[in-house]
From Swiss-Prot:
<feature type="region of interest" description="Short helix H1">
    <location>
        <begin position="26"/>
        <end position="29"/>
    </location>
</feature>
<keyword id="KW-0472">Membrane</keyword>
<feature type="site" description="Hydrophobic filter residue 2">
    <location>
        <position position="20"/>
    </location>
</feature>
<dbReference type="InterPro" id="IPR010617">
    <property type="entry name" value="TMEM175-like"/>
</dbReference>
<keyword id="KW-0633">Potassium transport</keyword>
<keyword id="KW-1133">Transmembrane helix</keyword>
<feature type="site" description="Hydrophobic filter residue 3">
    <location>
        <position position="23"/>
    </location>
</feature>
<comment type="subunit">
    <text>Homotetramer.</text>
</comment>
<feature type="topological domain" description="Cytoplasmic">
    <location>
        <begin position="181"/>
        <end position="192"/>
    </location>
</feature>
<feature type="topological domain" description="Extracellular">
    <location>
        <begin position="26"/>
        <end position="39"/>
    </location>
</feature>
<keyword id="KW-0812">Transmembrane</keyword>
<feature type="topological domain" description="Cytoplasmic">
    <location>
        <begin position="66"/>
        <end position="71"/>
    </location>
</feature>
<comment type="function">
    <text>Potassium channel.</text>
</comment>
<keyword id="KW-0407">Ion channel</keyword>
<feature type="topological domain" description="Cytoplasmic">
    <location>
        <begin position="127"/>
        <end position="133"/>
    </location>
</feature>
<feature type="transmembrane region" description="Helical; Name=TM5">
    <location>
        <begin position="134"/>
        <end position="162"/>
    </location>
</feature>
<feature type="transmembrane region" description="Helical; Name=TM6">
    <location>
        <begin position="165"/>
        <end position="180"/>
    </location>
</feature>
């Protein structure tokens, strides 16, 4: 499989994930502003998840700018990431319909941490396949953002059982960290 085909497949899966999430939003029953109130938790959950999917799509794009060719290991690592991201519509709907209850917020966090781990695995597989001359290895020599994200996810999951809104705050902090695209890869590609 070519790199372009893998990227197109991934883009398609991510687009479907967003489509599924937006289709879960229901039209309000009334015509007043007050009729929006019942769907507000689901809408907020959708916005949050949309941002996360967008972050992964953006970083996936940057990640594959460094890749020259793909092999079976990269394909499977990429599918592993897409698997965890594909569960996001379920978790999104659950936290929205439960109004951010404890177990749904914990489950959402587990999905986020598993997606982060899968993304890190994908990075490592690409580096291993590219060898010592890996542009990705050169670009991401520091993994501070990755490590702090995992710590915040763990804190969020642990906190979710007592204070689910604080847990959402931890997940929100991770999104803020990654909202600005990681410039390490672009910088490394320009230097080479």
């Amino acid at each position: 499989m070519t790199k372009g085909r893998l990227e197109a497949f991934s883009d398609g899966v991510l687009a479907i994930i967003i489509t599924i999430m937006v289709l879960e939003l229901k039209v309000p029953e009334g015509s007043s502003w007050a009729s929006l109130q019942p769907i507000l938790p689901r809408f907020l959950a959708y916005i949050f998840s949309f941002i996360y999917v967008g972050i992964y799509w953006n970083n996936h794009h940057h990640l594959f700018q460094t890749v020259k060719k793909v092999n079976g290991s990269i394909l499977w690592a990429n599918l592993h990431l897409l698997f965890w991201l594909s569960l996001m519509p379920i978790a999104t709907e659950w936290i929205g319909t439960s109004h951010f209850a404890q177990n749904p917020v914990a489950t959402y966090g587990i999905g986020l941490i598993m997606s982060a781990i899968a993304y890190t695995i994908l990075e490592n597989v690409i580096i291993r396949c590219e060898g010592e001359n890996s542009k990705l290895k050169e670009a991401i020599h520091s993994k501070f953002k990755e490590y702090i994200s995992i710590i915040f996810y763990v804190l969020g999951i642990a906190t979710s059982f007592f204070y689910p809104y604080i847990a959402i705050g931890f997940y929100y902090l991770v999104a803020l960290i990654w909202l600005i695209p990681d410039k390490r890869i672009e910088k490394s590609l320009k230097e080479n």
